[in-house]
From Swiss-Prot:
EC number: 3.2.2.27
Entry annotation: catalytic residues: D70
Compartments it resides in: Cytoplasm
Source lineage: Bacteria, Pseudomonadati, Pseudomonadota, Gammaproteobacteria, Pseudomonadales
Protein's UniProt name: Uracil-DNA glycosylase
Database matches in Gene3D superfamilies: Uracil-DNA glycosylase-like domain (3.40.470.10)
Signal peptide from the UniProt entry: none
Family per record: Belongs to the uracil-DNA glycosylase (UDG) superfamily. UNG family.
């Protein structure tokens, strides 16, 4: 993980984040990951998918930002997009509640899978604030340096162009609100879609419809939140 051509990173992000790859925290993070691999630990998502959120959604294409915390830590789940799982994997409980709100808000049929890649391809930056995790060990890579990198991503997006939508669900995501210029963007907050909190304000928040209305009011095409069958 340096700023050279070995980084498989979409060009606009590579340029915008070039200085981050030279920061001391990145060297420490790289060494931590090297040691984890050397110790035989299984790390998710697979290496080529760590930057999937950035590679799927170039900086100029970002319309909506959804923040998650860290990747799913079960086999074949994480693929670099927050809340999303790879095809063929059962839909996680928080995503089930996201689908329930989509159905309630926009009458979108609940899909038979949990892969949100089509959202990312349309301009939804689906960013976890920690980009790796050890198998079966939730939050095991929190505080290891990724938070500095993803904080900078949020700042870059906020500064790059106006009239974006930030969906901040739960206390962790809302802790990043200070990185967003709310005078330029629409920031929508609610409790997390987890089964522990979804019925305390996530279900019924109307965020998907409100996001599209804001985009259209500012001359941007809305997101098609429907997911293709897989």
């Amino acid at each position: 993980m340096t700023s050279d051509d070995r980084i498989k990173l979409e060009p606009s992000w590579k340029e915008a984040l070039r200085d981050e790859f030279e920061q001391p925290y990145m060297a420490q993070l790289r060494e931590f990951l090297r040691q984890e691999h050397a110790a035989g630990k299984e790390i998710y998502p697979p290496g080529p998918l760590i930057f999937n959120a950035l590679n799927s959604t170039p900086l100029d294409n970002v319309k909506v930002v959804i923040l998650g915390q860290d990747p799913y830590h079960g086999p074949n789940q994480a693929h670099g997009l927050c809340f999303s799982v790879q095809p063929g994997v059962p839909t996680p409980p928080s995503l089930v509640n996201i689908y329930k709100e989509l159905k309630r808000d926009l009458n979108i049929d609940i899909p038979n899978h949990g892969c949100l890649q089509s959202w990312a391809d349309q301009g939804v930056l689906m960013l976890n604030t920690t980009l790796t995790v050890e198998r079966a060990n939730a939050a095991s890579h929190a505080g290891k340096g990724w938070q500095h990198f993803t904080d900078r991503i949020i700042q870059v997006v906020s500064e790059h162009q106006p009239h974006l939508v930030f969906l901040l669900w739960g206390a962790h995501a809302q802790g990043k609100q200070k990185l967003v210029d709310a005078t330029k963007h629409l920031v929508l907050t609610s409790v997390h879609p987890s089964p522990l909190s979804a019925y305390k304000g996530f279900l019924g928040n109307g965020h998907f419809g409100r996001a599209n209305k804001y985009l259209e009011q500012n001359g941007l095409a809305p997101i098609d939140w429907r997911l293709p069958a897989l």
